[in-house]
């Protein structure tokens, strides 16, 4: 069974964290790609995904952001229960799940997977993201322009071709 792709919005905890840490992350020269507060097993995780407009994000960049963000979270204590803080890059093939992701990735090559095969017989399509709205994305492939409704998709990710 597949999950229908839906645009995600920050939950109240995630929004509170985003608002709190955004100035610190920005002052260090990074962007917040995503904030996820999620439970896995018995543990809660606060995952901060950072990006850069000028370069790829390295483990050193994540370390550079972790200390001041951790200090700020310890000082303000916005989450009552204990959690594990993780700061990482969204990766080369980052998930596009928020409105800001689709805005930032207009003109980028993406990979979209559907529940069923598309017209070309494949369940995946790679194309340039040329437009999007709350209901669908528009991809330009070498052969055609396709409008794909979110309700027919399981995911959309940045596409990177590994050699």
Residue ranges of predicted features:
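Short Lys/Arg-rich amphipathic alpha-helical segments
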Residues: 1-126, 130-163
């Amino acid at each position: 069974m597949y999950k229908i792709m839906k645009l995600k919005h920050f939950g109240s905890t995630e929004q509170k964290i985003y608002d709190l840490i955004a100035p610190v992350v920005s002052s260090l020269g990074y962007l917040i790609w995503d904030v996820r507060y999620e439970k896995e097993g018995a543990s809660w995780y606060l995952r901060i995904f950072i990006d850069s407009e000028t370069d790829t994000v390295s483990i050193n960049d994540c370390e550079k952001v972790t200390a001041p963000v951790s200090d700020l979270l310890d000082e303000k204590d916005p989450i009552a229960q204990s959690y594990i803080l993780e700061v990482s890059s969204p990766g080369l093939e980052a998930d596009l799940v928020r409105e800001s992701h689709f805005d930032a990735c207009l003109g980028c090559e993406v990979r979209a997977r559907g529940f069923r095969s598309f017209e070309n017989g494949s369940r995946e399509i790679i194309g340039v993201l040329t437009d999007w709205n709350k209901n669908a994305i528009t991809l330009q492939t070498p052969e055609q322009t396709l409008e794909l409704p979110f309700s027919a998709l399981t995911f959309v990710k940045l596409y990177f071709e590994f050699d």
